[in-house]
Curated annotation (Swiss-Prot):
Expressed in the middle/upper portions of the hair cortex, in the region termed the keratogenous zone. Keywords: Keratin, Repeat. In the hair cortex, hair keratin intermediate filaments are embedded in an interfilamentous matrix, consisting of hair keratin-associated proteins (KRTAP), which are essential for the formation of a rigid and resistant hair shaft through their extensive disulfide bond cross-linking with abundant cysteine residues of hair keratins. The matrix proteins include the high-sulfur and high-glycine-tyrosine keratins. It comes from Homo sapiens (Human). This is Keratin-associated protein 1-4. The gene is KRTAP1-4.
Amino acid sequence: MASCSTSGTCGSSCCQPSCCETSCCQPSCCQTSSCGTGCGIGGGIGYGQEGSGGSVSTRIRWCHPDCHVEGTCLPPCYLVSCTPPSCCQLHHAEASCCRPSYCGQSCCRPACCCHCCEPTC
C-alpha cells in the first residue's frame, strides 16, 4: 500500500499543517486515523493510486464553501463529516480547471483546489 510522499505538497497529505514541512505522514501528526496506511481520507488526490485497501469514497477531498484559493491559508480539511463540498474557488487563470462537480472528485485538478483558512470542518 502506498504511503505519503515527502516530496508531495502539504495539501496532498493527511497531516496537520505543522507537520508538512518535513514529512506528510508522521504518525504523531496525523489528522486521520488511517494516516499511516497511505493517508486515507483526503490522501491521494491527484495521484489516483493511493493505497489498494481503500475505496474511492475514502479519498474524496471535502472543501468548505468559504475556502480561499490554492496557495493561501492552510491545507484542505479532510473530515467526511464536513458540510458537503462546493466547487472550489479558483485563481482567475485557472477557471478552466473547474468542472461541474466537487473538489476532489472531478471538479478540480489538485492545483486548483481550495484551502481552508481555519480547520472548521
